[in-house]
């Protein structure tokens, strides 16, 4: 259905997954790609989105753009997480339908599954019991997105596919201490602690000039920097992380998520996502992950080893852990012809090397 000349709009092409999907498509010879930054196109604005689709008339759409963040952000900004994500999805999926887009790929999240879902989580676990409280608004928005895709397909015969990635990490990740996900946040915290531990103030100032922390940048005094970093559990002697470190998590390298996404975009149709002859068609989304898990503590220790931080690792058990276990069942993805290759140790090494290059992306809406 799609060929190398097809116009493909990647919504969120500067973000963690979007940038990787863009690069993957380019490497496969798809050069008629369209992307807009948040400044160029506000996906919360229905008029702007409609005008964009009127002008560009894409053949396919990859919707990676979302309002995202870690536990702290999800707890504090609950209205933002449900409202903004619903609005983005409503605008992009709605205009894709109005403009006859041939294929749409929607990226969700495994937080759609119940807090007490049986492990590993199959697609059929969706809506079987209550969600994790901390990110419930975000999860409900993502469930609405996948149900929009499913419902348009059933009512109008469209070809919209929803994929649910596990925890992702990789180039162009968000390392801001206030609102990033767990693995990049740990890399930055442990990196800064090592710099403080080795008295490498040049590296500390370079880091916080690139990504200021609550208004504190490299022009501030040593004490101001120390005080602010201590608020986030970063000291020369130790790094303090949220929770107990006991929750088990699965991590997928973002460039592999991109490869899986493009594989689905090019090779999987809606009819391939459910059993033929089913009386009730539901749970047509596809989990994307490794099917392997390890504890947050183990991840932190691997990062400590990679960065060579000689200080201590401490845990603040007064802070929430989130769901204790989240492992995807990826048998559906495997049956559709895709398997992961990059393991966690290699991924951490690659990501820290990328981080040291000093690249910073604006993650306001990616």
Where is each model-derived feature located?
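Conserved Rossmann-fold NAD(P)-dependent oxidoreductase catalytic core, especially the SDR/UDP-sugar
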Residues: 4, 90-135, 161, 174
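SDR active-site strand-loop-helix element
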Residues: 11, 36, 64-65, 104-110, ...
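C-terminal substrate-binding subdomain of Rossmann-fold SDR/epimerase-dehydratase oxidoreductases
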Residues: 12-16, 20-28, 192-366
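NAD(P)H-binding glycine-rich loop region in Rossmannoid oxidoreductase-like domains
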Residues: 35, 46-86, 95-98, 115
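Active-site segment of SDR-like NAD(P)-dependent oxidoreductases
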Residues: 68-69, 110-118, 166-169
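Hydrophobic positions on the long internal alpha-helix
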Residues: 88, 92-96, 148-149, 260, ...
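Active-site Tyr-X1-5-Lys
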Residues: 133-166, 182-199
